[in-house]
Design a protein with these regions (language model features):
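Nucleotide/phosphate-binding catalytic cleft detector across ATP-hydrolyzing
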Residues: 1-4, 26-131, 149-288
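Gly/Thr-rich phosphate-binding beta-strand-loop-beta motif of the actin/hexokinase/Hsp70
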Residues: 1-24, 128-147, 166
Length: 288
């Protein structure tokens, strides 16, 4: 069994994979929660028991993290409870070991682990396509791939971050829970914030896709991440929504680093559910 960690700015997602890469179970921990390697192990162990998983069967740990100040907890967890040195998803690990991502020569080195695993996953899905990846997280990121070369990208605030920015920097605007607006004509403060942020995001994403298409007219646009499924319904330029792209990419990173002889593995066949929406094909790889 392989244990992956997808550490984002909002949530930490532990992922239990079998040797073929099928996801056995996942759960979420708030990133801001204070914990040590001991409390983390207790959470993992209790969850594994609830899913009838034997935690002693974990043979490797892969960590994709965009929160460096908590990485040490996961290093200590691996060493103390599993006698494993966790492998972190980094650009050096990709470039030096598996050669799956080439960086455009003039680009500064700063590609985060979350974007690396997204790229590895889409390159596995569509090795021959020009690809634009849109990941709807705390920030919404755009990454352009052509001929296995990372060409660049951009970052805009995500929906939750936009709501928090309004609340934190104004005296009278409330902090609200985001809900999909029924109309752009908000009738109170909360509905107006929802409408403005939602349709503002839709509009900015459409415009950014348009700008990328000027340089890469054949780009195939893939969306992923929390709010991505709903927003994708409003953006006809998005070709496909893949809900677990990061989790797929973490195992692909493991496979390329540790299982090179197993060129494909069973796992990538996944469990596929196809839905028709906006005349495009949507994929749910793992039915958990």
């Amino acid at each position: 069994m392989i244990l992956g960690f997808d550490i984002g700015n909002t949530h930490i997602v532990p992922i239990f994979y079998n040797e073929d890469g099928n996801i056995l179970a996942t759960f979420r921990i708030p990133t801001h929660l204070e914990f040590t390697e001991d409390t983390l192990f207790i959470m993992l162990n209790e969850f594994a028991k609830s899913k009838n998983l034997e935690i002693s069967n974990i043979k490797n740990i892969i960590v994709s993290s965009v929160v460096p100040n908590i990485n040490e907890n996961f290093i200590r967890l691996g060493k103390k409870y599993f006698e494993i040195d966790p492998t972190f998803v980094t650009l050096d690990n990709v470039e030096n070991k598996i050669k799956e991502i080439k960086i455009f020569p003039n680009m500064e080195r700063g590609l985060g682990a979350d974007r690396i695993v997204d790229i590895l996953a889409v390159k596995k899905l569509y090795p021959e396509k020009e690809l634009l990846i849109i990941d709807f997280g705390t920030a919404t990121t755009f990454d352009m791939i052509k001929d296995s070369t990372y060409m660049g990208g951009c970052i805009i605030p995500g929906i939750a971050l936009s709501i928090n920015a309004l609340f934190s920097n104004t005296a009278a605007l409330p902090k609200i829970e985001f809900t999909e607006p029924e109309t752009v004509l908000g009738i109170n403060t909360a509905s107006q914030i929802n409408a403005g942020i939602f349709y503002g995001n839709v509009g900015s994403i459409k415009e950014l896709i348009l700008q990328y298409k000027k340089f890469f007219p054949n780009a195939y646009v893939i969306a992923t991440g929390g709010q991505g499924e709903k927003i994708s319904e409003y953006i006809e330029q998005i070709n496909e929504y893949v809900p677990k792209l990061g989790e797929m990419g973490i195992f692909e990173f493991y496979r390329l680093n540790f299982l090179k002889e197993n060129s494909d593995g069973i796992w990538w066949k996944g469990i596929t559910v196809k839905n028709e929406r906006n005349n495009e094909r949507y994929i749910n790889w793992f039915n958990i």
